């Protein structure tokens, strides 16, 4: 007993997915590969001869192509349910889909040079039966059955017959649907009107058919074969009967409507008789028979001269003989509103009705035949002029290349294809593979990697670095997903600019007027938007790193510039935003007049501060703010170093003269011009110290072991330029009550033999700076400062300080080469900040904070 089941087959073509069930008998699919293709062609309305490529996903997840029945059997062995198949039209068959063709046209858009005899016959018959009126449907079906059975080799005649029936049905259907007024037919089915006459009342011309002179054109027997005489006669007779019957029904139905025409009686004549061995070949440009009854509003056709030449630039094609032999072949040509026809041939005059027939949309008058041959052949074809230039792209699907414009059948001599017709095929929505990301740009945002502005496509915002963005290319090279946020679309603004011309980005961007370049980072503001802004110019006094004694009062002055596009209003303040609180005030109002500070003007801003009590490094951040509290512009800061040594009293008068020693300054003994005089005594008395002075002896004894290296003595300069708070102090020798005095030493002069005691006096002078307690305090202060900078290894810091003789700047440089700042410097280099010396200075200034260093570098670039 056969086991029956079913399998679900899902077929996808482009964006369309269809499914159907197929029977499975004894584990075999009840469809072969041919049946499967036919089913898919039916589902997606492909042309029956379309070439498909079918693929599916097998049990291993691979894409496999279905070629033959063995592949289907292999599918069944895999037990795939549902079976998912992807269909793809081959490159040459994408235009062969049935739904893309114009209705009623039996000729493909790309006509092959040799067509099968009964190509698309069934589809033609189906199209005809939809449009033929009900009284004729049975007769037509009978005629078609007889023709199919008796005329196996007369494919061209059957094709012509089916087209004639189709056009007749279309004409009936269109006239009935639109309610247009039809006119009574003139003539009979057996007679041919003679002469080229118009109606007596000046109305529309009668439509006539004359005899066409025989032409010696090459027969198309190579294409279709020699038709049988009996089949040809039978097909022609059936066609004539069918057309005559249609005319009778049309005349009976519209006879009572002809009285509505005033001034003239419109007359229309269809092709009503055909001689034997002749083809029914009066066609419009899209391959259909001309069987329309036109009604116009104005009885006066457009005036045309008899010697009218073909329109310049339009293609010209020769008539094609479709007869069975050269001797008997005759071709009917059609001429709309032609005043005269050549006496040697025949023409079909179609009345002008103010609009163009179906398939001839928006055409100027065109002579299809060559003007050189028009006189001899007597055949011409003119298309109605509708008062404006043609939209030629509408003819794209109507006139195929290398095809006769009358019948749609490929020609033998391959006439020149139209040159001025633009064959535009409207793109489907599924043909657009762009996801739209390439056309989106982030306005006002610059890539910090490559500098492109604006960033086009995805934007990557750094989580670690403030105001740091990358484009997709730079992110692929240097970024990682953990540190960045992807933003596919830009931020929306209250009044965004128009995106009307964003598609013109490729090579058609309008040049911007020259403006002052502004680096807008992060989310940024719109260019040209009114805003308050400020820029730091310089420190007027109290430079960064100034050493002060505890609790010293001082005033810091910054010079600021208004670099925005708004005037700073009166009431603008400098407010404290963070850091150490060195002032008892949180805001200081700027000295601005009622008119405000104009753009590009500078202003000195002063704030009173007090140094903290404890030693260390202190920094306070300030920023400008409007009267409403809105902060703007670059921030400024004050950076000081509090040293407790400057306020600790020492023994003797010698030490007071050396208070405020700045260990950060380089040695000052190399670039001295002229004699460097050290005046230790305010009132020098004796050259040598008195032996009764116990304080001096104690100092000399305590420093005797330390000052063995004389080079160390010279590396301690005396520079009071950065000292704050000790200008009012005097080193009077009477304060201590000691009669000891020291001489004035001229370092440029060579010591004489008489002054042999001067070196010992110099040792006594520098002794307080090198005592054990002083070294310990200096070392602890420098170690604390290094620890605040980020150098946590105390032993290494001590070693470096002692090696550099407590030179803080040199020690920091050495520590940067061997300690924790190497990764920070390397990271700054990767960000694009390659000035190593500048990076070191900023790291020292910002206590090793990479965030603050980056912000300072960005502010410096601006």
Curated annotation (Swiss-Prot):
Can you say where in the cell this protein is located? Vacuole; Cytoplasmic vesicle, Autophagosome
Q: Which organism is it from?
A: Solanum tuberosum (Potato)
* This protein's name: Protein JOKA2
Which ranges does the record mark as transmembrane?
A: none
* GO CC term, one of those recorded: autophagosome
> What PROSITE patterns does the record point to?
PB1, UBA, ZF_ZZ_2
The UniProt keyword set, sorted, is: Autophagy, Cytoplasmic vesicle, Metal-binding, Plant defense, Protein transport, Transport, Vacuole, Zinc, Zinc-finger
Q: Where is this motif: ATG8 interacting motif (AIM)?
A: 817-824
GO terms, molecular function: zinc ion binding
Q: Where is this region: Disordered?
A: 92-117, 194-234, 295-345
Regions of biased composition (Low complexity) lie at 92-106
Residue pairs linked by disulfide bridges in the UniProt entry: none
Report the protein's function.
Autophagic substrate that functions as a host autophagy cargo receptor. Requires ATG8 protein expression to be recognized as an autophagic substrate. Activates ATG8CL-mediated selective autophagy, and contributes to defense against the fungal pathogen Phytophtora infestans.
Give the comment on domains.
The ATG8 interacting motif (AIM) is required for the interaction with ATG8CL. The AIM motif is required for JOKA2 function as host autophagy cargo receptor.
Note the zinc finger regions (ZZ-type) by start and end residue. 442-492
Pfam families referenced in this protein's UniProt entry, alphabetically: N_BRCA1_IG (PF16158), PB1 (PF00564), UBA_NBR1_C (PF24932), ZZ (PF00569)
